[in-house]
Amino acid sequence: GGNWNIYTAKIAREEEVNFPNATLIEEEAVLPVSTKERFAPQFSPDGKELAFIEDRTKLMVVDLKTKKVRQVADDKYQYRTGDGFTYTWSPDGKWFAMEIIGNRHDPYSDIAIVSADGKGEVVNLTNSGYFDSNPRWVLDGNAILFSSERYGMRNHASWGSLQDVMIVFMNQDAYDKFRLNKEDYELLKEEEKRIA
């Protein structure tokens, strides 16, 4: 067997403008082939970096120009050896929201954030003891939506859970704006335009 690796693909002939129907595609490995499993790539919002999962448990980022690789989150937050975990870049490219296995409570996942520069600690945002999954940045990166089964029928015997969509705010201002009624929100928008 082989190992999973990450490749870029582009149309080889300039006259072919439609990727799905191109007759010749050029593939190039993003990193040299190794014994490490690399998969689930996501380009950074500015397109200069590529995040990926390595060995099914680590969140890594490669600078596409220099090919320098940094670790963002190590394997102490993942105990599964299946097909990785869900993660997503923040809109400004400075953070990741990701699923983690907090407190070795496998298989139950929590939602966490970690700095994309690889220098910060992973911060567990949910710590629920139930399945929290599928984080998505919303409100221009000021909040994260995620699925949770903490309030529905719960998965106590490995079957039959229900999930709700939850939101966690990254700052007080985003929370305060979210709580405004429609009339107050419109007044706030007018005031912000006037000040700008």
What are these language model-derived features?
Residues G1-F19, P32-R38, K48-L64, D74-G82, ...:
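A flexible loop/linker signature enriched in serine peptidases of the S9 family
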Residues A22-V30:
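A short helix->beta-strand "capping" segment at the edge of beta-propeller domains
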Residues E28-A29, R70, V123:
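Structural signal for short hydrophobic segments within the conserved structured cores
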Residues S44, S115:
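Residue-level recognition of the GNAT/N-acetyltransferase active site
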Residues P45-D46, P91-D92, L139-D140:
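Residue-level detector of Asp-centered blade-edge/turn motifs that repeat once per structural unit
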Residues F85:
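DHp/HisKA histidine-phosphotransfer helix
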Residues T88, L139, G160-Q163:
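Generic structural microfeature
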